[in-house]
């Protein structure tokens, strides 16, 4: 009996390891991936980030953290079709209805991944997000993403904002190494209860070390600079108020206006790259069809120019290393076609943008960014504009509430242009408001919305007789008449011989900080801390009996 028992135990001991091997995922540890370089784009104009390969694509670290105007929505040309993601370099396919985990060891940041990346227009992917949500995430990765049927899916993990923020602060030339774990299984486990792919009875688990070096940092600077451009019926531009770097210019046989539209800094570790292309593109398809390639041109130095024609002309990464600005030239015919198409009172940020294409990464190499400066383009016949006297789109102020505290003052320049002076000019202030005791007040709120504090506000300007006229204007969305302001008149003559005039005046919007009512909330409670508000100032002009 003792012998039989011993034999039974030996057989058991031999069989047990074999049984355990058959009841586990197949783990493959790949050799370390070759180190790769990336270019990081810090977009302060649009408040987002973009990362793109500086050389070879795989292992992948590529794409933006936000959608741009190039996002594919189901029709038209396919440009941006997913947000940013990583992989281990093998671009391994996933099986439909299997579950997938991806997690990082030695991750440079906590919570680096949000889920399974997919191409947004492929069947089974989310067109809005390009993301298949997992059952759960943690500080290392995500778990339990079900691979949907339809288009192909791969072992790609979508990058979190925290990952982009880490890359933003990395010095150029520095590197990080991480271990990417990617595991898929047909077992229907519950990741939200703690189960993981690597612990299941079957599946495939891949492990690989990858290293990425920050080879360059391109910082797009939002200068907030603003300028007005008035155009006549023949497209001839006239510069109005503003501080954008613009000048009239002739290039070849074309006359028009050139402006510095993008300001940037580019730091590199010596990276050489010609696959990254940057060029402008007109957003309005009718205008893009109406103008010729040389009616809009762009330059890195303001003297050597390239025409705008889809992807045909561009500046490479290597060319951008020797500059810090991008200039754009608009011919008179460009403006004339705008007039013909009825495109007026438009902001250049709505008219065109710059595109970024990395031909190395076709699925995630497309990106779009706005200009650093803004032009407000208006017709010279019968138009009105208002801009901050600081020539910025979003002037802001801050201060303290209490006796003797200074008001928050905002200065503006109002311009009308027409064959004659406007017969009527009106102005109003809009924003959060509340009527207290029969008077309208602008309402400032705390971040949590619990404290709402009333502030009086006024509009004032100098009249023709030299007096100051002041209106109570508590963000109440009501028009006030400023026709009798002191206007500075500049005559103009159109190319056709017609004459007209441009009239300018200034107006001040003021929010007193020393009014006793602002010491308490609209509910008559005391308050402490910070409150804020934003609003808009609108103007309109009327011309009557114009032939």
UniProtKB/Swiss-Prot annotation:
<comment type="function">
    <text>Part of the ecpRABCDE operon, which encodes the E.coli common pilus (ECP). ECP is found in both commensal and pathogenic strains and plays a dual role in early-stage biofilm development and host cell recognition. Tip pilus adhesin, which is required for assembly of EcpA into fibers.</text>
</comment>
<comment type="similarity">
    <text>Belongs to the EcpD/MatE family.</text>
</comment>
<comment type="subunit">
    <text>Forms polymers. Interacts with EcpA.</text>
</comment>
<keyword id="KW-0281">Fimbrium</keyword>
<dbReference type="GO" id="GO:0009289">
    <property type="term" value="C:pilus"/>
</dbReference>
<keyword id="KW-0732">Signal</keyword>
<protein>
    <recommendedName>
        <fullName>Fimbria adhesin EcpD</fullName>
    </recommendedName>
</protein>
<feature type="signal peptide">
    <location>
        <begin position="1"/>
        <end position="23"/>
    </location>
</feature>
